[in-house]
Amino acid sequence: MRNPGGPGWASKRPLQKKQNTACLCAQQPARHFVPAPFNSSRQGKNTAQPTEPSLSSVIAPTLFCAFLYLACVTAELPEVSRRMATSGVRSKEGRREHAFVPEPFTGTNLAPSLWLHRFEVIDDLNHWDHATKLRFLKESLKGDALDVYNGLSSQAQGDFSFVKQALLRAFGAPGEAFSEPEEILFANSMGKGYYLKGKVGHVPVRFLVDSGAQVSVVHPALWEEVTDGDLDTLRPFNNVVKVANGAEMKILGVWDTEISLGKTKLKAEFLVANASAEEAIIGTDVLQDHNAVLDFEHRTCTLKGKKFRLLPVGSSLEDEFDLELIEEEEGSSAPEGSH
């Protein structure tokens, strides 16, 4: 993974099984105990051989390898337990667990707005509590940035938003600390969308095509799987997205990527947010960028002269097979009633 913003920015420690030294057992020459009367021997020698040395030659290496294996497993368990207890990162079966550590910030080694954005992304991915977040914040500040922090009152140091504004005032562009974000309403169709089958990178995805959503969103788990948690793939999102009930959506950042629908590839801009159970939602922004034509009557989506089948949300499992017929012949005319 690239280290965004400089060396050591986001240290990821995947929990991987180590090769135990017990594998030495496999390298031991195979020794089979055969009763002495059946052993071949040179002519004129007594063929009767004691069985004890043969048994010990087999048992001793086996016991030694077993001892080494148990010792390695015993030594590994505390380390695994410690990582799992301290990482606090999101995990899914079959995926590696990542622990992200912020890069030190001196005030000049990185744009303050970018460093603060990445720090908040790491906070969300690691699921830090308030005390842990403040502890990592203080430990990450160095040089002039630490001087700014130490110049605050103890009450201000306990308020992340206050520390954030102080750092932006000290090292950011004029007026950066007081910029007013644009507010965007995320009013999706509430279960009335359609699925479109494709890929993001190498990962198969079932996109929810939602003409009622103004922005396109992917779940953080999908972003992490495709990018291996590369924070350099995220850029700050400076606006505010609110859902129908008025709550503010937590946005990790903007992800510029490419989606594949059959052989058709499309550039897409997604907000990375845990907004719903859907792994990816294609909103009107992406649809308009590529002049998509949705025909809900015939359940098709036309993009770049090609039609793709849509599956309504809530359809039976048997209808899932329709998604395999993702792409029709190029040049087929669009059905009447397309809009």
UniProtKB/Swiss-Prot annotation:
Residues 34-53 are annotated as: Disordered. Residues 205-286 form the Peptidase A2 domain. GO terms for cellular component: membrane. The chain crosses the membrane at residues 55-75. GO terms for molecular function: aspartic-type endopeptidase activity. The keyword Acetylation does not apply. It is found in: Membrane. One of its GO terms (biological process) is protein processing. Keywords: Aspartyl protease, Autocatalytic cleavage, Glycoprotein, Hydrolase, Membrane, Protease, Transmembrane, Transmembrane helix. Protease responsible for filaggrin processing, essential for the maintenance of a proper epidermis organization. This is Retroviral-like aspartic protease 1. It comes from Mus musculus. The lineage of its organism: Eukaryota, Metazoa, Chordata, Craniata, Vertebrata.
